[in-house]
Amino acid sequence: MKELIDQGKITHWGISEATEEIIRRAHKVCPLTAVQNRYSMMYRNYESLFPVLKESQIGFVAFSPLANGFLTCRYDEYSTFEKSTDYRSIMPQFSSAGIVENQKLIEWLKIIAAEKNATPAQISLAWMLAKNPFLVPIPGTRNLKRLTENIQAESIHLSVEEVTEIDDMLEHIPMSQVFGGSIVKK
């Protein structure tokens, strides 16, 4: 990558699913621009990387910031997904047991959304945007209405106190495993 940058063929580079050790090693060889890892209210394991990212001025690109759509709060224990075509059919957060296990999170997220005149998805994204200036969520969607909804999350203000309150709540709310991750260690 350093050779490509030196040749002017690329201007920035990043890595995905990286640990602190890998970030430090890669950054020493050729300064990183960004690290892309799974991150959401339900999967916060990579928060331990934030100090090194801040120190090294590396951006954090959060993929699956809505836990594969679960944090939209649009699903219940009766939701079904076609096993042969819809990957959510194998994700623990979308199983009937997972939805029941995550009920307190869903209820709590809906309350905050109502207080802010927002959707649960917008609160999830606004929380991320308010946490750190180097954190950029990249939610995916195939729906223009959802894209507009996600973009509007940027206009929702969460104070430092509100972010801290959300973080504290997330530490104590029981949650299921999420696809591609594991239970957040308390």
Identify the residue ranges that each predicted region occupies.
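Beta/alpha (TIM)-barrel catalytic core signal, keyed to glycine-rich beta->alpha loops juxtaposed to Asp/Glu
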Residues: 1-173, 183-185
